[in-house]
Amino acid sequence: MARVAGIDLPNNKRLDIALRYIYGIGPAISDEIIKELSLNPAKRVKDLTEEEVGRINNLITKNLKVEGDLRREVQSNIKRLIEIRSYRGLRHRRNLPVRGQRTKTNARTRRGKRKTVGAGKSTSSIKRVK
């Protein structure tokens, strides 16, 4: 297995797909890396030479923010929004959708599992004996 940016890339995958296993690298950036290093995107990870793996690793570590650094930056951005009490920060704090989605229905992923309220007895429903 080739190790790039602290991640073991799967051997049997194509290079363009395997690079996407790294947090912060998607299809566009993966293709850009392959073009810049003039590698074959259809080449399997197990067929890469040590020199090619080293070139990929150097390019990613020098030019891109990936994995732990990127996760830390995203978390600090969210924390900053919460601290300055912006609308987006309040939505994050309350675990509600941040980008304007409706919440009357849907938003189950963000709001969590439904809480069912049991039928309780009200004082007016109890019969009074005189």
From Swiss-Prot:
<keyword id="KW-0699">rRNA-binding</keyword>
<feature type="compositionally biased region" description="Basic residues">
    <location>
        <begin position="97"/>
        <end position="116"/>
    </location>
</feature>
<dbReference type="InterPro" id="IPR010979">
    <property type="entry name" value="Ribosomal_uS13-like_H2TH"/>
</dbReference>
<dbReference type="GO" id="GO:0015935">
    <property type="term" value="C:small ribosomal subunit"/>
</dbReference>
<comment type="similarity">
    <text>Belongs to the universal ribosomal protein uS13 family.</text>
</comment>
<dbReference type="Pfam" id="PF00416">
    <property type="entry name" value="Ribosomal_S13"/>
</dbReference>
<keyword id="KW-0687">Ribonucleoprotein</keyword>
<feature type="compositionally biased region" description="Polar residues">
    <location>
        <begin position="121"/>
        <end position="130"/>
    </location>
</feature>
<dbReference type="GO" id="GO:0019843">
    <property type="term" value="F:rRNA binding"/>
</dbReference>
<dbReference type="GO" id="GO:0005829">
    <property type="term" value="C:cytosol"/>
</dbReference>
<dbReference type="InterPro" id="IPR018269">
    <property type="entry name" value="Ribosomal_uS13_CS"/>
</dbReference>
<feature type="region of interest" description="Disordered">
    <location>
        <begin position="97"/>
        <end position="130"/>
    </location>
</feature>
<keyword id="KW-0689">Ribosomal protein</keyword>
<protein>
    <recommendedName>
        <fullName>Small ribosomal subunit protein uS13</fullName>
    </recommendedName>
</protein>
<dbReference type="InterPro" id="IPR027437">
    <property type="entry name" value="Rbsml_uS13_C"/>
</dbReference>
<dbReference type="GO" id="GO:0003735">
    <property type="term" value="F:structural constituent of ribosome"/>
</dbReference>
<keyword id="KW-0694">RNA-binding</keyword>
<comment type="function">
    <text>Located at the top of the head of the 30S subunit, it contacts several helices of the 16S rRNA. In the 70S ribosome it contacts the 23S rRNA (bridge B1a) and protein L5 of the 50S subunit (bridge B1b), connecting the 2 subunits; these bridges are implicated in subunit movement. Contacts the tRNAs in the A and P-sites.</text>
</comment>
<dbReference type="InterPro" id="IPR019980">
    <property type="entry name" value="Ribosomal_uS13_bac-type"/>
</dbReference>
<dbReference type="InterPro" id="IPR001892">
    <property type="entry name" value="Ribosomal_uS13"/>
</dbReference>
<dbReference type="GO" id="GO:0006412">
    <property type="term" value="P:translation"/>
</dbReference>
<dbReference type="GO" id="GO:0000049">
    <property type="term" value="F:tRNA binding"/>
</dbReference>
<comment type="subunit">
    <text>Part of the 30S ribosomal subunit. Forms a loose heterodimer with protein S19. Forms two bridges to the 50S subunit in the 70S ribosome.</text>
</comment>
<keyword id="KW-0820">tRNA-binding</keyword>
